[in-house]
Amino acid sequence: MTQDELKRLVGQAAADYVIQNVPEGAVIGVGTGSTANCFIDALAAVKARYRGAVSSSLATTERLKSHGIKVFDLNEIESLQVYVDGADEIDASGAMIKGGGGALTREKIVASVADTFVCIADASKRVPVLGAFPLPIEVVPMARTAIGRRVTALGGVPVLRVTKDGAPYITDNGNEIIDVKGLQIADPRGFEAQVNAWPGVVTVGLFAERGANLCLLGTPNGVETIVYPA
């Protein structure tokens, strides 16, 4: 199977999971990125079962609305049973690097209030140690250089994310992103807390404190379901 076929496979598997585990009339939390888009496309076929969705980005909101799925502001929702999203990397504990699509802050907010985080990914995203994929850090623009110095002191290589025309990439929240190369993150939870404590960091794309509860992993032999201990 191609990577796109694996993404569609796990997108459908996530929709099947929601149908089997989330009652009708609920609101679904939805992530951002190409794999999350496959879930949205599969969810559209059963959209009548659910009130709608909470979105983690403007791009996801647009795709949900294109399928006629109602989008709620998180502040309107009392509880969220499930959040479905992809990952750039996931380790054996369910800790992830996320934010390749630029939506890490809103993804982390929505994930934090969901009862269950379902990660959907192809098998290439499963790694023994996080860090081969550059770690995104969303920063207040004036703190960009200061945060870069802190990253360098820890052995990382900070790279400002830019658009095709070379301008700084701006998140939905009006901030910038530093992508950090060259890390091997042996303690994801500790490193997440350390970076989040730096003044000027909005959030780091480590999802360890709130990792995945389960992962639907697309493999050439089908979908593998991995459940992580609480």
Swiss-Prot record:
GO terms for biological process: D-ribose metabolic process; pentose-phosphate shunt, non-oxidative branch. Substrate binds at T32, G33, S34, T35, D85, G86, A87, D88, K98, G99, G100, G101, K125. The keyword Isomerase applies. Gene3D superfamilies: 3.30.70.260, 3.40.50.1360. PANTHER family: RIBOSE-5-PHOSPHATE ISOMERASE (PTHR11934:SF0). Homodimer. InterPro entries: NagB/RpiA_transferase-like, Ribose5P_isomerase_typA_subgr, Ribose5P_isomerase_type_A. This is Ribose-5-phosphate isomerase A. GO terms for cellular component: cytosol. Pfam families: Rib_5-P_isom_A. The keyword Isomerase applies. HAMAP family: Rib_5P_isom_A. It comes from Burkholderia ambifaria (strain ATCC BAA-244 / DSM 16087 / CCUG 44356 / LMG 19182 / AMMD) (Burkholderia cepacia (strain AMMD)). NCBIfam families: PRK00702.1, rpiA. Keywords: Isomerase. Belongs to the ribose 5-phosphate isomerase family. Its EC number is 5.3.1.6.
